[in-house]
């Protein structure tokens, strides 16, 4: 199974909810901070909006927001 990519901003308290959930449940994520140009450009190319982070990219799909990301992680990994 491919490692999901989490587009987030490290200081963002909203993003920390998803990061902490994954950490607490031992779910490996490829975390990419959109404050850096590379991840920011990747997210835009996928159709995401850095103002609406976090996003989870998995299987060609882009999942937006804590609730949707946590729901996906729960169904897939727990």
What does each of the following model-derived ranges do?
Residues 45-52:
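Thiol/disulfide oxidoreductase modules built on the thioredoxin-like
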Residues 69:
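A basic- and aromatic-enriched beta-loop-alpha substructure that forms the phosphate/nucleotide-
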Residues 28-40:
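Thiol-based oxidoreductase modules, predominantly thioredoxin-like and allied folds used
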Residues 46, 75-78:
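Rhodanese-like catalytic fold shared by cysteine-dependent sulfurtransferases
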Residues 54-62:
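A short, hydrophobic beta-strand/beta-hairpin element that forms part of a small beta-sheet core
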Residues 1-29:
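Local sequence-structure signature of Cys/Sec-based thiol-disulfide redox active-site neighborhoods
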């Amino acid at each position: 199974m491919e490692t999901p990519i989490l587009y987030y901003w490290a200081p963002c308290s909203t993003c920390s909810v998803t990061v902490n959930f994954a950490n607490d449940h031992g779910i490996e994520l490829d975390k990419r901070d959109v404050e850096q140009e590379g991840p920011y450009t990747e997210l835009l190319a996928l159709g995401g909006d850095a103002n609406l982070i976090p996003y989870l990219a998995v299987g060609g799909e882009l999942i937006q927001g804590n609730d949707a990301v946590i729901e996906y992680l729960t169904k897939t990994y727990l």
